[in-house]
Regions:
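Helix-rich terminal scaffold detector
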Residues: 2-35, 39, 43-222
Length: 222
């Protein structure tokens, strides 16, 4: 191994370490400067709840129901008047939308798209959705924030008098690492909420679990 190769190898290793450190600092800065909120979880099959040392989580804001045909253009970027879209069926479009990023405008009061069942324990509601984190209709009189997600599943729902699109959103906060022995606390809990930090770019981070009114991390440290 000649000296030039050694220098190149060391340089690559150092660059990777520096990149990792910068990424960690960036992520921590997002958490430190973000906004903390509490999200209500919804029950899932207990057999799927725990996976090793991780708990699977699902939220009241995970399923978004959008009504009327305008949602193709306003919510999903599908312009029915665009000639390039006319040859694409709605089914093809819906299929291609899976995996795409989506931004959810949450408010402290239910309105607009808040057609999904919301329990009394919830404090944040889906107000609108968009392809970008810019919302022209953001209400000034209601506390609001934007959270970024990814379309996990999307389906059409037809009834005799209505038409809807149901979107399942993955926010990247659907799994949480548990210390050994803490799984039973979650399995036996009557109510589980999640403290989440929302960064300025919409990315969400779990900071704690609230199990039957008790913060899990705080109780451990105490």
């Amino acid at each position: 191994m000649n000296a030039r190769f050694k220098i190149a190898l060391v340089s690559i290793i150092i660059l990777q370490i520096v990149s990792l450190v910068v990424f960690v600092i960036y992520q921590e800065n997002l958490k430190d400067t973000g906004t903390k909120i509490v999200l209500q979880t919804i029950p899932i099959d207990p057999r799927d709840l725990l996976r090793g040392e991780y708990v699977d989580l699902r939220y009241e804001i995970s399923d978004v129901t959008v009504e009327n045909m305008s949602c193709y253009r306003l919510c999903l970027g599908y312009d029915l008047g665009d000639s390039s879209n006319r040859s694409r069926s709605r089914k093809d479009f819906l299929s291609s939308a899976q995996g795409e990023n989506i931004y959810i405008l949450l408010t402290k009061e239910p309105y607009r798209l808040s057609t999904q069942a919301i329990s009394s324990g919830s404090s944040w509601y889906v107000y609108d959705i968009s392809e970008s984190n810019s919302f022209d209709n953001r209400p000034e009189e209601i506390e609001s924030l934007v959270i970024k997600g990814r379309i996990e599943e999307i389906e059409e729902i037809f009834t005799e008098i209505d038409y809807q699109i149901r979107i399942t959103v993955d926010y990247g906060i659907e799994q949480y690492f548990l210390e050994e022995g803490k799984g039973l606390l979650i399995e036996n809990a009557d109510d589980v909420k999640v403290e989440v930090t929302i960064a300025s770019n919409g990315k969400a981070f779990i900071t704690d679990l609230i199990v039957d009114g008790t913060y899990l991390n705080q109780s451990v440290s105490d």
